[in-house]
């Protein structure tokens, strides 16, 4: 049996743990479902004014914003200035064509009537999507996007401040974990 001091054991263990938390996922193996804290998603955003800007602000500290697209560059100038390294586009199709291989997901906050097609195009490329409400305008569009999500394996979410808020997620976790007991009524 090795004669190691408690202090040396704790010091070595702490160093090993620190190494694991900063090791890239290629070393740890993403195939096992592990994503290293140093890994960031490369995100593109289509429609970056108003809610689009708010959505980008929610992830700008944790993810890489690599491409921005808006038809109104005068209105979008402030957001473009905030992310000088991000490539800028007028047309989302050109952005998808040029950046498709280097983005993991897309934030969509364009005019409502364009949500479904921009989302479908991203999903077809295998990109995860966060889209502002409404995601679609018809049952047909909803069914199409459901089939696309199933066939491509991408994750999609329709944004809604009330349902996408961090506080809402926290309360759901409390309920699911039984931390606040059985919920029988909510007013």
Model-derived features: where do they sit?
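N-terminal secretory signal peptides and thylakoid transit peptides that target proteins
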Residues: 1-17
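N-terminal Rossmann-like NAD(P) cofactor-binding module of classical short-chain dehydrogenase/reductase
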Residues: 106-107
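Beta-strand-loop-alpha-helix segment that lines the small-molecule cofactor/substrate pocket
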Residues: 111-112, 116-164, 178
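N-terminal Rossmann-like dinucleotide-binding module
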Residues: 13-83, 162-165
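Local beta-strand N-terminus motif with an aromatic residue
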Residues: 65, 85, 103, 180-183
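Short amphipathic alpha-helix with an adjacent loop that forms part of the alpha/beta core around
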Residues: 94-101
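Short acidic-hydrophobic, aromatic-tinged amphipathic segments that line or gate anion-handling sites
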Residues: 87-91
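NAD(P)-dependent dehydrogenases' Rossmann-like dinucleotide-binding region
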Residues: 47, 179-187
